[in-house]
Each structure stands twice: as C-alpha cells, then as structure tokens.
Amino acid sequence: GDGALPAVDVVIAARDEQAVITRLVEHLAALRYPSEQLKIWVVDDASSDRTPELLAGLQQRFAQLQVLQRPADAGGGKSGALNTVLQQLQGRWMLVLDADAQLQNDTLERLIPYAEAGGWAAVQLRKAVANAEVNLLTRAQAMEMALDAVIQQGRLSVGGVAELRGNGQLLRRDALLACGGFNEATVTDDLDLSFRFVVHGQPIGVLWDPPVREEAVLGLGALLRQRQRWAEGGLQRFFDYGAGLLSDRLKPSQQIDLLCFFLLQYVMPVLAAADLLGAALTRTLPCIWPLSIVALGLSGLAIVRGCLRPSEGPALPAMNPLAMALGIVYLGHWFVVIPWVSVRMALLPKRLVWAKTLHLGEDHEAAATA
C-alpha cells in the first residue's frame, strides 16, 4: 500500500523561468503519489523576471511547495542551488528536474519502485523532446535523445556505466551525500555527478518509460552554446576524476566502457578534425575518416532502433532513409564542437560559465525573434 512508498523531494533550480514555472508546479502537484510523502522544492536562483511573484502565488495554492531564495552573488551555478536545498531535504529520494520538464501522472509510482527493486543509487529517465515538430533541428534532437537512451541501456547491459542527464535524474539522498553532494566547480552538474557516483561504487540505472519531456533548443546558435558546455563539462570530469576511474574501485568492464566512450566521443572527433586539416594542407586524402563514417553509420542505426521502440510520451520521429540521414548529418556537429572545446581547454585556463538554456513553454514565437 501507500505506506510502502518512501518520501520523495522533487527539486528544481529555477532562474528566470516565468514562462514555465506555473505549469511545472501544477503538474507536479497532480502526480499520483501519497501527498504526505511528496514535497516540491523550487530554488529561485536570483531570478530577475516574474518567477518570484509566480512562486509566491503558487505557495498559496499548494501546501507541498517549498521555495528557497538564493542571492545573486551566491555562486556555484546550478550545483550551488541544488546544494542549498540538499541540506534541508529529508526524503529518501531526490528527483531533479529542469523548469521546462513535464512528467506523466504515473511517473513517481512507477519510477520509485523500479529504483528500489533494482537497488539503484540513481535512475535517469529517458529524455523525450516535447517540441520535436517545430523544425528539423528539434526533430534531430528528439532522435538524439532516443539514441542516447539506447546507448545508455546498451552500456549498462554489457557491464558498463550509465550517466545522469540532469533533467529527470532520481538520486538516493544517502548515496548523494556519501559522494559529497554536487560539484560547484563544474559547468555540467549531471555529468560530473555521474563520475562521482561511479567512483564511489553507486550504480546508476536508466528507465525508458515513462520519460521526462523537455524542450529542445530551436536554433543552431543556442544548440552550439549548449553543446559546448556539455563537451567542456564532459571532458573536464575525465581529468577531475581520472585517478579514481583508473583505480581498482571500478570493475574492469566499467573501465573498458569508459575507455571506449572516451575514445569515441572525445579522441575520434579531435583526430578526425586534425586529419581533415592535414589532408587539406597536404592535398592528400584523409585517412581516419573511414572510422568516423562507420561510427556515424552505427549511430544512425541506433537512432532507427531507438525511434522504432514502443514508447510513451511524445511520439518519436518517424523513421525512413531521409530521417536517418538527417540524424547522421546532425550528429556531425559533435565533430566541430569537440575539437573546438578540446583546443580551447588545452590553451585557456579553466573558466566556469553557466550558459542558461532559455525555456519558452508554449511560446515558440518569442524564440524565433530572440
């Protein structure tokens, strides 16, 4: 019965989220879960728009909503906001959401038993793009999210490592505290925390359904800014946790998984870019590109596999040769972003820039002009 369900804290770090915060809190309050076991925490991270007023109004309506204010000079980015609230939590589980997240009503009553039964320290929900039909770029991101979930599940199935994705990550509070909370010296709290969990022997699971819905960015500039941050944080953590990852705390299968992941995601794009540059300068044919083309081809097949899987939430993009080609061409952006970020990180000192992604809710027109 309900008595068996543990206490859950749903946590959102919100900065300037007036477009989506009301919808989010209303949806969370409607989740099917024992009301005395569910608290909603919103950290208003020095918002300069109407977010604080909206939250004050929502607190009048929803008793389970707790709002924390954070001053503008608090520092630590999203991790700092999450650490602020972490000190006050008492629930067994902490579900971290972005302000643009949308959950099905049955999410918690399915997710929590899955996490408990599997013995997971954390579970990442599959991310599903809510605005896939807006343009080709949002459709490609919907494919990429399905691809990512397929790859994460595949890595787990061969004894590898699954990773947290920030939005829709369920964390067991005692495991999180044992890992030292959120790292405030990173631009990607989720990728960093994934390695903290791995190094501390805390297993991370992945759940295909129910998914968490989120907005894909609408334009190329916003995409490249977002991906630059992901690439920087993703690469930085290999240096931050390198010693732990190489130690005997990890199973050999996990170390092999991380090595393959590092070679494919970071080394190969850098080599491919250098190879292409060298070929252009010497007017010869590039030699590493066949490998890159095979990798992109396999990614294309994984996209098809993911998008054809039965799924709840927003419909995944229909699959045909043209759609697969779009997905593969789109993935090529990593072959630009990764080398660029790698060179910049090698030459410039570490600098922390939390580039906030704009969440629009239903207002896509505003973004087209932004």
What do the predicted segments below correspond to?
Residues P6-D9, K39, D192:
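Cell-envelope/extracellular polymer assembly enzymes that use nucleotide-activated donors
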Residues G1-E26:
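N-proximal low-complexity "stem/linker" segments adjacent to membrane-targeting elements
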Residues S194-V212:
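Catalytic donor-sugar/metal-binding loop of nucleotide-sugar-dependent glycosyltransferases
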Residues G1-D2, C260-P349:
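Membrane-embedded multi-pass helical conduit in multi-pass membrane proteins
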Residues F62-P71, G75-R92, N105-V187, L224, ...:
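Long helical/loop segments within the catalytic core of UDP-sugar-dependent glycosyltransferases
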Residues E26-A72:
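Acidic donor-binding segment of Leloir-type glycosyltransferases
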Residues V187-L193:
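Acidic donor-binding loop at a coil-to-helix junction in glycosyltransferase catalytic cores
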